[in-house]
Design a protein with these regions (language model features):
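Gly/Pro-enriched, hydrophobic low-complexity segments
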Residues: 114-185
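An acidic-aromatic
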Residues: 51-99, 161
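Short, well-ordered turn and helix-capping elements at secondary-structure junctions
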Residues: 35-39, 56-58, 66-68, 129-131, ...
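Positively charged n-region of N-terminal signal peptides that target proteins for export
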Residues: 1-3
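N-terminal signal peptide c-region/cleavage motif recognized by signal peptidases
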Residues: 7-14
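One face of beta-strands
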Residues: 29-35, 48-52, 60-62
Length: 185
């Protein structure tokens, strides 16, 4: 019986380690998301949904389509935020410490091992920053289906952001997919 349990454990190890590898091995991701921001007590503070695009090394597109219409586009070291309801556009430079969690999730494995401790369990991997002053204290990545990922982030205040990412398979992204749309305000 022990031998069977050990064999099952050893067979499960590569699958567990592969969860993060499958995520970081991609050059990019695109699809739909749902996002919930939760208080430390678990109360839902905000919910939104929309579409996203991620492309290595520094391209990020996060378009909230419900309940509002907002867009965040990061290209290299620049971040542009557009809020159509408020008719506001904000552009600013990003430092390396301000990069989104997706920057880390698309980083090479060696970079992750330098910046985080990794704990793989089942179909999930928890990344804990080695730097105790990091804004996000924990990132959990779980594969819930072939094209369904859950990413949960815990910040310094104890709030968590729970993201469900439904990815489109076999979509090739290029930097031109991350152009900021022109607005008339």
């Amino acid at each position: 019986m022990r031998g069977l349990l050990l064999a099952l454990y050893v067979m499960a190890m590569p699958a567990t380690a592969d969860v993060l590898q499958q995520f970081v091995a991609r050059d990019g991701l695109t699809g739909q998301f749902t996002q919930r921001i939760l208080s430390p007590e678990g109360a839902v503070l905000d919910q939104s949904s929309g579409d996203f695009k991620l492309l290595k090394p520094h391209f990020f597109w996060w378009h909230i389509t419900s309940p509002d219409n907002q867009l965040m586009v990061a290209a290299d070291n620049s971040l542009t935020q557009i809020d159509w309801a408020l008719e506001v556009t904000v552009e600013r430079q990003l430092s390396d410490t301000e990069r989104s969690p997706f920057y880390w999730l698309l980083a090479p494995r060696e970079t992750l091992l330098t910046a985080f401790t990794l704990d793989a369990t089942g179909a999930a991997v928890t990344l804990t920053p080695r730097d105790p002053s990091a804004y996000y204290q924990r990132l959990l990545v779980a594969q819930e289906g072939p094209d369904l990922w859950r990413v949960t982030l815990l910040d310094q205040a104890g709030q968590s952001i729970d993201l469900a990412l439904s990815t489109l398979p076999e979509v090739t992204l290029v930097p031109g997919d991350f152009l900021v749309p022109s607005v008339n305000f």
